[in-house]
Design a protein with these regions (language model features):
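Bacterial Sec-dependent signal peptides at the C-terminal "C-region" and cleavage site
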Residues: 4, 9-23
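Basic nucleic-acid-binding interfaces
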Residues: 19-197
Length: 197
């Protein structure tokens, strides 16, 4: 499977580290946010915008929950999952948009329609699909994929100049991912992640 990088935007695959990550105040804010009711409101806001993007009927919902900052050192990825199958994932570690609303809707649209690796989600599938937001630290070198706790940390592979991102929501078989990384002679990195469902 091939993953693309364009304008610092990365298509991703979900997974979930070897040594503990140092404390990251920005990621810690998101970790605390993920446990509050506002996190659910954020996912509902994303669902409203997904419905609007899919039907052409604009979502007028305003992003009510005050989210922690998205900019600086954090990556942002949105994954769409239907049943146990990923239907799209899109995001980046560096962002062109500065406003949270614009950034999140852009990455949501990317996950819905710009990730050509997956069959697009149909409107009747939306209500039973999961929309997953992953907030990520910067990748750091990792010894091997087997040493990464893929339930909590993501994997970033650099293979012949191509970036592949695996967020904790997607990867089901780390061993298969490790074989692929060895076969392609990839540099392996890991990143800390907060997942909001």
């Amino acid at each position: 499977m091939r993953y693309g990088v364009a304008l610092s935007v990365v298509f991703c695959i979900a997974v979930g580290g070897s040594e503990p990550f140092p404390s990251d105040p920005a990621l810690d804010e998101w970790r605390a946010f993920s446990r509050r009711p506002e996190a659910r409101e954020l996912i509902n806001w994303l669902r409203c915008h997904a419905r609007g993007l899919m039907t052409g009927n604009r979502c007028d919902a305003v992003l009510i929950p005050r989210t922690p900052p998205l900019f600086g050192t954090l990556g942002v990825f949105i994954t769409i999952v239907k049943g146990s199958a990923v239907r799209g994932c899109y995001g980046a570690f560096d962002h062109r948009a500065r406003e949270a609303e614009v950034l999140l809707v852009d990455y949501l649209e990317g996950a819905l329609v710009r990730d050509a690796r997956y069959r697009p989600l149909l409107i009747h599938e939306l209500e039973s699909a999961q929309i997953i937001l992953t907030i990520a630290s910067r990748p750091r070198p990792a010894g091997s994929i087997e040493a990464i706790d893929t339930a909590r940390h993501g994997v970033f592979l650099e293979c012949d100049g191509e970036a592949r991102v695996y967020v904790p929501a997607e990867v089901r078989a780390a061993a298969e991912l490790a074989r692929e990384a060895r076969r392609l002679n990839c540099q392996v990195y890991e990143f800390n992640a907060v997942t909001i469902r």
